[in-house]
């Protein structure tokens, strides 16, 4: 049994009972409502017309094949796909990984099965669970890494570091964001920042943010019209420890947040780092904001609030959780982008889920430890002054660990022998090595089995409850305490 995820409002949970079988369970009342065997499901017809017709698929129950930058598949390629099933031996694909996204509690789900061959990992199926039919199939040029959607938009992240944005009402492609070309853009944006320090440009942070946003828009448009010669060779995101992440707000505003590559350091021109986050308006297909260096390590986990106004981030070290204003508000101040900071713990942790409740009063945090943490957002004790976030770097325990792998901070030998500069250097090093004890800890917690992977959901209908689903086949309902402490188990069920 492998638990995949809850839907957007935590009314349903998706589990994989085997390498090719997917089941969807209602959370309240608890029970199985849908099951599909991806190994035996076959499409009935194909039509390479480039657009999806919902009415046609409803009336005829036909599946429509849409290709994105790839030609029609031949019989030889189909045979090659079957051979891939026997050749896949890596940890990524051998157990049959699914990429699946539900559309709230509707009958539409998006499914990609990366365990049925490399070519099938490029195919995304939009399935109607009530009719048990495939509405359309979208074939991409590279394997699918992640899918997010709401009632307006669907975004697909590929292993080639590209994000495809669709209008979900007609499955019309709206935009393609190439993260590598954005990476090249940000190198250009940094040149503007350096010029401002020498007096070439006005050194106002708001102006620089506008310059960076304009460059991002130009690079995004260029990714659709043609390739950039300065784009570096693509990585394989599926099999890389460092890979982009993306999240989409649940409301109709459709704010997309995705991690972005930082500009290479002077002493490491070929360095790759995902320290930055881009805020993108998919409804109007335009970038909104750019958050620079949100962590000292690579951003490993993201969550966006229901209305797209707040963004939660965590690095690959998993010790600090930060909450930012995304900048979609009209009264947004770039100098006060950091809203809250929480300390999960001092032990390193691989975080794989952050989640807001709908009222934006709480954040849930799930990782590979024996504790699930709940942090309270309306606690004024962990508010931060605006000047702490003006330059995108904050004191945290991660600085100690990051300094071991980040030689950009330099050594005393690299500093000119000037007493004031040497004193300033050592004061910064000492300050960064002292853990910030003022960060708030969790408000509530849940103890789980560390050997099982779990996922968390905040039900919209029951704001004082939290759902936990685990790979051992258990579905648990906990009551959130009114005072800091451990959550109380109120109900337990089994996925069968």
Swiss-Prot record:
Residues 46-57 have a biased composition (Low complexity). Keywords: Autophagy, Cytoplasm, Membrane, Phosphoprotein, Protein transport, Repeat, Transport, Vacuole, WD repeat. Signal peptide: none annotated. The keyword Membrane applies. WD repeats lie at residues 1-35, 148-190, 294-334, 346-385, 448-488. Residues 75-84 have a biased composition (Acidic residues). It is found in: Cytoplasm; Vacuole membrane. Residues 41-86 are annotated as: Disordered. It comes from the Eukaryota. The modification Phosphothreonine is found at residue 213. GO terms for biological process: autophagy; protein transport. A motif (L/FRRG motif) lies at residues 342-346. Coiled coil: none annotated. GO terms for cellular component: vacuolar membrane. The modification Phosphoserine is found at residue 237. Belongs to the WD repeat PROPPIN family. Required for cytoplasm to vacuole transport (Cvt) vesicles formation and mitophagy. Involved in binding of phosphatidylethanolamine to ATG8 and in recruitment of ATG8 and ATG5 to the pre-autophagosomal structure. Protects ATG8 from ARG4-mediated cleavage. Essential for maturation of proaminopeptidase I. Contains a beta-propeller domain involved in specific binding to phosphatidylinositol 3,5-bisphosphate (PIP2). The L/FRRG motif is essential for the cytoplasm to vacuole transport (Cvt) pathway and for the recruitment of ATG8 and ATG16 to the PAS in nutrient-rich medium and in both its recruitment to and dissociation from the PAS under starvation conditions. PANTHER family: WD-REPEAT PROTEIN INTERACTING WITH PHOSPHOINOSIDES WIPI -RELATED. This is Autophagy-related protein 21. It comes from Saccharomyces cerevisiae (strain YJM789).
């Amino acid at each position: 049994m492998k638990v995949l995820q809850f839907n957007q409002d935590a009314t349903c949970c998706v589990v994989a009972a085997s390498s090719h079988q997917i089941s969807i369970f209602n959370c309240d009342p608890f029970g199985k409502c849908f099951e599909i065997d991806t190994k035996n499901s076959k499409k009935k017809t194909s039509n390479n017309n480039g657009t999806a017709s919902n009415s046609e698929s409803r009336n005829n129950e036909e599946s429509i094949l849409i290709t994105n930058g790839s030609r029609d598949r031949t019989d030889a390629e189909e045979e090659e796909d079957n051979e891939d099933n026997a050749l896949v031996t890596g940890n990524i694909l051998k157990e049959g990984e699914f990429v699946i996204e539900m559309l709230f509690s509707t009958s539409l789900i998006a499914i990609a099965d990366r365990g049925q061959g490399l070519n099938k990992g490029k195919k995304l199926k939009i399935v109607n669970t009530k009719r048990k039919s495939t509405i359309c199939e979208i074939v991409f040029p590279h394997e699918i890494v992640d899918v997010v959607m709401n009632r307006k938009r669907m975004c697909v992240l590929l292993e080639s570091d590209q994000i495809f944005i669709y209008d979900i009402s007609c499955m019309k492609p709206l935009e393609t964001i190439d993260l590598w070309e954005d990476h090249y853009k940000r190198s250009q944006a940094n040149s503007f920042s350096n010029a401002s320090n020498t007096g070439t440009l006005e050194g106002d942070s708001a102006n620089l943010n506008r310059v960076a946003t304009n460059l991002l828009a130009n690079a995004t448009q260029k990714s659709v019209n043609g390739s950039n010669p300065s784009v570096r060779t693509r990585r394989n995101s599926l099999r890389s420890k460092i890979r982009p992440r993306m999240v989409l707000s649940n409301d109709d505003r459709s704010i997309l947040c995705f991690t972005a590559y930082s500009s290479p350091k002077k002493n490491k021109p070929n360095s790759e780092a995902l320290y930055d986050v881009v805020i993108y308006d998919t409804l109007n297909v335009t970038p909104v904001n750019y958050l620079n260096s949100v962590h000292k390590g690579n951003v490993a986990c993201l969550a966006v609030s229901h209305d797209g106004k707040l963004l939660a981030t965590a690095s690959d070290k998993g010790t600090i959780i930060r909450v930012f204003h995304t900048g979609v508000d009209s009264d947004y101040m770039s100098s006060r982008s950091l809203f809250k900071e929480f300390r999960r713990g001092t032990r390193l942790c691989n975080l794989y889920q952050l989640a807001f409740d709908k009222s934006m009063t709480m954040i849930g945090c799930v990782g590979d430890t024996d504790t699930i943490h709940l942090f309270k957002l309306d606690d004024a004790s962990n508010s931060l002054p605006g000047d702490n976030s003006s330059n995108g770097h904050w004191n945290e325990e991660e600085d100690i660990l990051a300094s071991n792998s980040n030689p950009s901070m330099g050594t005393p030998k690299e500093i000119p022998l000037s007493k004031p500069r040497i004193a300033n250097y050592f004061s910064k090093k000492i300050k960064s090595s002292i853990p910030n004890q003022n960060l708030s800890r969790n408000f509530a917690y849940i103890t789980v089995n560390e050997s099982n992977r779990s996922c968390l959901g905040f039900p919209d209908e029951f704001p004082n409850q939290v759902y936990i689903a685990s790979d051992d086949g258990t579905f648990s309902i906990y009551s959130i305490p009114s005072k800091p402490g451990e959550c109380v188990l109120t109900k337990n069920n089994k996925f069968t």
